[in-house]
């Protein structure tokens, strides 16, 4: 687990704190669209294009952040998130397609002998300088040093709980590791000397060895400070091999794009779809699926197996940290779906797909 490497004074702390708050409050406006640009592009950034999308009210977000901070300062959750020992023998078997939940949106996928890692985050705090932001609730059971060499890292967007500087720098030491990133993030990675970058736009496809890797849409937003709101793209990813294919949903609200992705690139044998950080709905609804919507997204992308992600690791919303899988499985049972195909993993658990 990473720790802060240098000392910060009180002024640095409050600057980081209020910067993080402002990042989520203000939907910074972007330039008007022009006919020459794709619909999700603007003059100086990106936007969501689903006709049902409506940005959360900034004042509502501010009031929620303040009240949430007050409530959390007087209460602590005691729920235990199930975890298990990492099965490195199974993961290192190149002839077995496997998937491991490391925590939050970080997963390890073995697909046709190659190793994929999604949104690697090992830091204790998901926030500026690893100083303020969402604190890790559940410790990871797998260290970076335990992992085999990673072939491809998929990044969904630049929020701190999905793009962690210390983690990507650790993986970038392996010069054979390639990073697939949404449009606009190449400069950030290059500033830290990270190479092997594949920057892609929605629906763009790239051949990598025997795989076709597709940058697919999501309904979300981006930003790491009050001044870069939606300057870089957010995405999901479809990975298509000769026999196997999987979908990484990243971070997204429910939108029509799930069905489009399923129609264009499905069926998938595996999908990694978020189920957590969904309350209150007036704040989270525009950018995060709830568990019921996650079930529908699973059906929309036409997947045979699902690993529920984006829960149990960081305290990011109002629902109890162990509530997402309960609501998710209730919806699975209500719809009469195959329980075994969507059963939530323990942190550190590996399954064959």
Predicted features along the sequence, with ranges:
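Divalent metal-coordination and catalytic microenvironments
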Residues: 109, 119, 157, 213, ...
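Active-site metal-binding loops of divalent metal-dependent hydrolases
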Residues: 120-122, 158, 218-219, 250-252, ...
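Metallo-beta-lactamase
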Residues: 2-133, 140-146, 182-250, 269-276, 327-349, ...
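Catalytic core of the metallo-beta-lactamase
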Residues: 106-112, 207-269, 285-293
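Active-site metal-binding motif and surrounding structural segment of the metallo-beta-lactamase
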Residues: 132-181, 196, 266-272
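Acidic/histidine-rich helix-loop elements
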Residues: 122-139, 221-228, 279-288, 315
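Cap/insert and terminal regions of metallo-dependent hydrolase folds
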Residues: 30-31, 37-41, 48, 143-144, ...
């Amino acid at each position: 687990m990473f720790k802060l490497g240098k000392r910060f004074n009180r002024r640095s702390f409050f600057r980081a704190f209020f910067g993080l708050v402002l990042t989520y409050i203000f939907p910074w406006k972007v330039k008007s669209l022009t006919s020459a640009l794709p619909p999700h592009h603007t003059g100086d950034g990106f936007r969501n294009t689903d006709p049902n999308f409506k940005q959360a009210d900034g004042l509502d977000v501010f009031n929620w952040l303040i009240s949430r901070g007050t409530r959390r300062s007087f209460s602590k959750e005691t729920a235990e998130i199930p975890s298990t020992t990492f099965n490195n023998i199974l993961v290192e078997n190149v002839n077995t397609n496997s998937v491991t939940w490391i925590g939050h949106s970080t997963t390890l996928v073995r697909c046709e002998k190659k190793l994929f890692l999604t949104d690697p985050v090992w830091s204790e705090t998901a926030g500026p300088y690893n100083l303020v932001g969402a604190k890790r609730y559940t410790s990871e059971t797998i260290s970076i040093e335990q992992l085999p060499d990673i072939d491809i890292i998929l990044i969904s967007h630049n929020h701190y709980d999905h793009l962690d500087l210390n983690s990507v720098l650790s993986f970038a030491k392996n010069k054979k590791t390639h990073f697939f990133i949404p449009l606009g993030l190449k400069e950030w990675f290059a500033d830290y000397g990270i190479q092997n970058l594949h920057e892609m736009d929605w629906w763009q496809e790239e051949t990598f060895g025997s795989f076709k890797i597709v940058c697919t849409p999501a309904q979300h937003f981006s930003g790491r400070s009050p001044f870069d709101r939606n300057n870089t793209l957010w995405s999901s990813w479809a990975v298509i091999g000769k026999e196997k294919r999987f979908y990484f949903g990243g971070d997204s609200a429910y939108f029509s794009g799930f069905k489009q992705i399923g129609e264009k690139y499905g069926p998938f044998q595996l999908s990694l779809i978020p189920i957590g950080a969904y309350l209150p709905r007036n704040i989270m609804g525009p950018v995060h699926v709830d568990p019921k919507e996650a079930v529908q997204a699973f059906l929309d992308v036409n997947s045979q197996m699902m690993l529920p992600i984006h829960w149990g690791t960081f305290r990011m919303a109002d629902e109890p940290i162990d509530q997402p899988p309960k609501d998710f499985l209730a919806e699975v049972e209500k719809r009469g779906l195959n329980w075994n195909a969507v059963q939530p993993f323990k942190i550190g658990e590996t399954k064959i797909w």
